[in-house]
Design a protein with these regions (language model features):
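Hydrolase catalytic cores
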Residues: 1-33
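Hydrophobic alpha-helical scaffolding
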Residues: 9-13, 36-39, 109, 153
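Noncatalytic accessory or regulatory domains flanking protease catalytic cores in secreted, cell-surface
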Residues: 35, 118-191
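Secreted peptidase-domain scaffold signal
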Residues: 38-115, 123, 186-191
Length: 191
């Protein structure tokens, strides 16, 4: 349904990474704040995702859905937005990563993302930086380890990242930055 709504609204099908980002971005959080090992990103809220698509259709210049790409000459993109300082800020980045090298080890802890894109939000002061959720390395799998909360930091292992500020406490202009370190294995990496 979401794919059809997007196609009807914009005349083309959304990329898989965009659908994934919309569903994660609008999911109702369950359990620990942010992603966790028990509930993932939460419960899909299709209406909230559809509302974003419709709001973007009504005002495509507002930064609700941003599709861009990292290239060999454009390794960083930025989007600025004005915020009220009261309501939460949530930014979600997702991309379809090229196939990595096959892994032979079961439950490998080695990052296997090919194009490691990074998301961060910089506050109005230009110095305060907010980083995405990262799942803690839990070592031995146990019930206690599986209930660990996500933290924030540089995410080196996932092709989806989310920055969430529950109470920004500061109104003004924020900047969302998507960047990539390392070489591209393709001409571009859309997100």
């Amino acid at each position: 349904l979401l794919q059809q709504l997007y196609a009807n609204s914009f005349g083309q099908r959304p990329r898989a990474s965009l659908l994934k980002a919309l569903l994660i971005h609008t999911a109702d959080d369950l359990g620990n704040p942010g992603p966790d090992y028990k509930f993932g990103w939460g419960l899909i809220n299709l209406k909230a995702a559809a509302d974003i698509v419709l709001a973007h259709k009504a005002n495509p210049t507002a930064p609700r859905i941003i599709e861009n790409a990292i290239t060999s000459t454009l390794k960083t993109t930025t989007t600025t937005f004005t915020w009220d300082g009261v309501s939460p800020i949530r930014a979600t980045l997702s991309w379809t990563d090229p196939a990595g090298a096959p892994q032979t080890a079961a439950d490998s802890r080695t990052p296997n993302v090919v194009h490691d894109l990074d998301l961060k939000i910089t506050g109005p002061d230009g110095a305060t930086t907010y980083l995405p959720y990262v799942m803690p390395f839990v070592g031995t799998w146990s019930a206690a380890a599986m209930s660990a909360s996500a933290t924030t930091g540089k995410n080196r292992v996932d092709n989806t990242e989310q920055v969430y500020l529950s109470n920004p406490n500061r109104s003004g202009t924020y900047t969302a930055t998507v960047s990539m370190e390392g070489p591209l294995t393709t001409n571009s990496q859309p997100y």
